[in-house]
Amino acid sequence: MMMSLTKTPLPRLSRLMLLVSALASTSLVHADPNLADEAPAAPTASPPAETPSNFHVTGFLSVIGGQVFNGSLPGNYIGPSQINGVTCPCYIADWANGGVYRDNFSLKPESHAGVQVQYNFSPTLNFVGQVVVRGEDTTPNVSWAYFNYKLDDHWEVHAGRQRIPLYYYSPFQDVGFAYPWVSPPPELYGWDATNYNGASLRYTNSFGDNNVTASVFGGEEKVAESGYYKILYAGHTDVSWSDIIGADLELNHGPLTVRAVYLQSNTTTTNPGLSLDLASKLKAYGVAVNLDFDSWFVLSELTQLTRDYGPTVYSYKAPAATIGAGLRLEKWTPFINYATYSESADNPTLFPTTPSKFKRTSLTLRYDIDSNSDIKTQVDHHLDTTSNTSGNVNVVRVSYDRIF
């Protein structure tokens, strides 16, 4: 997140991994099979057999409300007075879509709903599509539209519109029921592109008690009127990521899951109103390490993104990290989390603003209503350590998540 502001579970992780698999190649939750029409039959006739449908519709919903309380701007604050129309002190909860909370309760910044469809042409070929609407943008957005072809028991190809797998929770980032927070840590999960149009090759296998998943992917993405840059700049900003190339590898052994990812892309950012036309080379590295011991679990993730604008301009690094631990007490899951984000530039005199640093501590309490829905309450304490982002704030949020 380069900032002219003066700026990633289900009740058990095993269920979470099942959801990952479902999102990768099927729908979230299969709809009930359609029953064959019953023809009149003699009393001794066998009951008609069920005929599974090739078409499935599923969905997810997160109604999230929150507000800032006890917010303040330090005396040496040099950041903006407003972010995306919201007066600061404020809290940026969703960088990718421009979701910002203020001192009045609002459902707009993060609430969203999605519908996913899947059509199976054959046992080896299907199509998956997903449309999402948000409080910040009520226009339906196609986030997935890809064909999945299974080459054999271990290899499959996806071609079309997909999620950039930059983070551990990227494939199901919009499915609030899939994780313990109200929303994934914005210190990591929030950049100017989250999807891409292209192709990926995916491999899965098991070796004894070890499970392996790997993929390579490539493509491009264009975002008109970027929600991310509404936070940073006035007016309309368009974004293009071209020549996206990346790979990820995930290993699971018992309670331990480790994932590594690499991505690179050429990017351009244009805003005619500000005479802005920037080109950069982006590189990203990430590692996630998770532990799940049934009654308690630990989630951690570290990423570093770099943007190089050329030798006559500047380049900067933006490492971000999160670590959290939770305890499962039947239907209740308390979860504590810490996250941090920082920037550093190789030529500070040319960097548009003072590099930003901020950190956040949060406490979440989740209650599982049933196997398809939950409610969560989360309190965040956000510190703007360089006094140039949004101020120091406390935030309270509540959410209702459902899959159907």
Feature roles, as predicted:
Residues 50-53, 66-111, 229-239:
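Surface-exposed strand-loop-strand hairpins of Gram-negative outer-membrane beta-barrel proteins
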Residues 92-96, 122-127, 134, 175-183, ...:
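Flexible, solvent-exposed coil segments and beta strand-coil junctions
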Residues 56, 62-66, 102-223, 250-254, ...:
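Outer membrane beta-barrel
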Residues 100-106, 172-175, 185-191, 229, ...:
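Extracellular/periplasm-exposed beta-strand and loop segments of Gram-negative cell-envelope proteins
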Residues 85-89, 153-156, 191-330:
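Signature for the C-terminal beta-barrel architecture of outer-membrane proteins
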Residues 53, 103, 107-113, 139-143, ...:
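Residues that define the transmembrane beta-barrel architecture of outer-membrane proteins
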Residues 4, 34-36, 101, 148-150, ...:
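Outer-membrane beta-barrel pore domains
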Residues 2-7, 13-83, 90, 399, ...:
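N-terminal periplasmic/intermembrane-space "pro-region" immediately following the signal or transit peptide
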